[in-house]
Amino acid sequence: MKYQLEISNITKSYGDLKANDDVSLSIKSSSIHALLGENGAGKSTLVKIIYGSLMPDTGLMKWAGEKYSPKSPFEARENGIAMVFQHFSLFESLTVEENIILGLDKVGLNENFTEEILKYSKQYGLDVNPQQVVGDLSVGE
């Protein structure tokens, strides 16, 4: 049987805490799945690994039979993988500008709009360096 996404023996730890411990699963193309579990079970961590915003400590992923190891959400998007957020969110590992570009790409606009968006951001009180990593911003920014 052919699978679109295969995950084998994924492990991700935060210090002594194992968020994912030897997780394996296979997903067929055009199928719908849900990750269910208690708070702290590692669901979000696994999704972030699939989406490329976190790297696993160990394990292997395959997309359409080929090794798959996205280094960013941009690479994941090239394979048609995107994330729909329950609550508004930014990718903490990306810069302000990269977050804007990712959003523009999603709605079919190009990077030329980035400068204009940053101009309006300043006008409305969001005056940040576009090259600053979002995870380094204060909560109010």
Where are these regions (language model features)?
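Glycine-rich phosphate-binding loops of nucleotide-dependent enzymes
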Residues: 1-141
